[in-house]
From Swiss-Prot:
Sites where the protein binds glycerol: 87-88, 139, 256-257
Organism annotation: Corynebacterium glutamicum (strain ATCC 13032 / DSM 20300 / JCM 1318 / BCRC 11384 / CCUG 27702 / LMG 3730 / NBRC 12168 / NCIMB 10025 / NRRL B-2784 / 534)
UniProt note on regulation of activity: Inhibited by fructose 1,6-bisphosphate (FBP).
Stated name of the protein: Glycerol kinase
One Gene Ontology CC term in the entry: cytosol
InterPro entries noted in UniProt: ATPase_NBD, Carb_kinase_FGGY, Carb_kinase_FGGY_CS, FGGY_C, FGGY_N, Glycerol_kin
Gene Ontology molecular function: ATP binding; glycerol kinase activity
A biological process from GO: glycerol-3-phosphate metabolic process
Purpose: Key enzyme in the regulation of glycerol uptake and metabolism. Catalyzes the phosphorylation of glycerol to yield sn-glycerol 3-phosphate.
Length: 509
């Protein structure tokens, strides 16, 4: 007979752009169980990307159950739960029925570009940069909320009456986990977010960590819709949904990229990581002093512990990373599955002069060109699918180089090495390309899915399962290092070719 052990594990829900995952870690920080499930990507029009919030909630319940059953544990054995999520993705729902008024508008969606141009006016997209750390563009949540209120029949009137709630995905998940319309104990569910997610809305003042009435008024968003902002690490509420994690306390909430930084042990000023997921996201811890970028990066909050000052970060966000490989698989059908791209790309020594610029929804950091669209340059009769596959991998490495260069200028010093995570870092060829194009070591950890592990660490810290960040750092180990194997002359020549290719993507929309 199995003997249960109270509070032996920490759980994490990782609600990502393409799938939802649940993991359990033990006291050594090892993943002992994991389950995941993909959800539909909805493309109603060119440039529009949506998800079904109710499908995602169903998937969350499914993966939590699967992960628990696989190791035969009970809620009694779970010390706490952490939640991490795709950031900026926007849900608006009726607080009386729990029904979304529209699909979730995903962070990649560009339908709000015209709204953003109007708001930015003559001052341009940097108008609120000093206050929010963000540019006025289609990326943050604020313009997405405005679009829903202006375009969904009756939504604005319902919002002004106080009947609608807004949340990024963490808020939607927390609201449902704590009972939804009515908790099982009769209490209302919590309508909250954490500082990292709130910092991605274009509605929060980074210095006060509070919603800014002036920004809300400028976007015509009723503040009654907005969730309470709380620190990332601390007590939220126990799960009150009649499900497999009933009564487990929720003690950590982080946006996905901040969770990855946490999972990499990025607790010290200057620590940096790059996540190779659906997009590419480079974050550098800048300590408790807010630094506003002068080179096309965003300023954000890395995390905040209850009772402590927030820790800030610089971020370079690239919209197309792993999703470019998915496009090669699903749209062009050049590979049967994502991992197959590595072997195909290895069949040629170089890209044959081909470059793929994945500006499918414009270019994000550090260029911020919403007018750009995807292009393939350098095609000749010599080029084949192997060259295109190699160019797709190189596009990820070159885009990262752009962000690393911008971050070095903002920080006043170059990175000495780069820690990486995400599904794509299993691709050894891509990691060698990255080291070559950066000219620094690239380090991969033992567990490459640091987003889920990171928020599990945060929840463990919030519940006392882990006592200090020093304890967490000791659990993190580098598994493999790639050293640069390219001359400086070759590196800069290749980078110049990439920059010429990118210029061909401009003025297309």
């Amino acid at each position: 007979m199995r003997i249960s052990k109270a509070n032996a594990y920490v759980a994490a829900i990782d609600q990502g752009t393409t799938s939802t995952r649940c993991i359990f870690i033990d006291a050594q920080g090892k993943v002992v169980s994991s389950a995941s499930k993909e959800h539909r990507q909805i493309f109603p029009q060119q440039g529009w990307v949506e998800h079904d919030p109710e499908e995602i909630w169903d998937n969350i319940r499914s993966v939590v159950s699967q992960a628990m059953v696989s190791i035969d544990i009970t809620p009694h054995e779970v010390a706490s739960l952490g939640v991490t999520n795709q950031r900026e993705t926007t849900v608006v729902w009726d607080k009386h029925t729990g029904e979304p008024v529209y699909n979730a508008i995903v962070w990649q969606d560009t339908r709000t570009s015209d709204i953003c141009l109007e708001i930015a006016g003559e001052e341009g997209q940097e108008k609120w940069l000093d206050r929010t750390g963000l540019l006025i563009n289609s990326y943050p949540s604020g313009p997405k909320i405005k679009w829903i209120l202006d375009n969904v029949e009756g939504a604005r009137e319902r919002a002004e009456k106080g009947d609608l709630l807004f949340g990024t995905m963490d808020t939607w998940v927390l609201w449902n986990l704590t009972g939804g319309v009515r908790g099982d104990d009769g209490d209302d569910a919590i309508h909250v977010t954490d500082v990292t997610n709130a910092s991605r809305t274009l509605l929060m003042d980074l210095r006060t960590q509070q919603w800014d009435p002036e920004l809300c008024e400028a976007l015509d968003i009723p503040m009654s819709m907005l969730p309470e902002i709380r620190p990332s690490v601390g007590e939220f509420r126990s799960v009150r949904h009649r499900g497999t994690l009933a009564d487990v306390p929720i003690t950590g909430v982080l946006g996905d990229q901040q969770a990855a930084l946490f999972g990499q042990g990025g607790f010290h000023e200057g620590a940096a990581k790059n996540t190779y997921g659906t997009g590419l996201f480079l974050l550098m811890n800048t300590g408790t002093s807010l630094k506003i970028s002068e080179h096309g990066l965003l300023s954000t909050i890395a995390y905040q512990r209850e009772g402590s000052a927030p820790v800030y970060a610089l971020e370079g966000s690239v919209s197309m990373g792993g999703s470019l490989v998915q496009w090669l698989r699903d749209n062009l059908q050049l590979i049967p599955n994502a991992p197959a791209i590595e072997n195909l790309a290895r069949e040629v020594e170089d890209n044959g002069g081909v470059h793929v610029v994945p500006a499918f929804t414009g270019l994000f950091a550090p260029r911020w060109r919403p007018d750009a669209r995807g292009v393939i340059t350098g095609l000749t009769r010599f080029a084949n699918r192997k060259h295109i596959a190699r160019a797709v991998l190189e596009a990820n490495a070159f885009q990262t180089r752009e962000v690393v260069d911008a971050m070095a200028k903002d920080a006043g010093k170059a990175l000495e090495s780069l820690r990486v995570d995400g599904a794509m870092v299993e691709n050894d060829l891509l990691m060698q390309m990255q080291a070559d194009f950066l000219g620094i070591d690239v380090q991969r950890l033992e567990d490459v899915e640091t987003t889920a592990v990171g928020v599990a660490f945060a929840a463990g810290l919030g519940s006392g399962f882990f006592k200090t960040t020093d304890e967490i750092e000791k659990l993190i180990a580098v598994k493999k290092v790639w050293n640069p194997d390219m001359s400086e002359e070759e590196r800069e020549r290749r980078y110049a070719e990439w920059n010429r290719a990118v210029e061909h993507s401009y003025d297309q929309a």
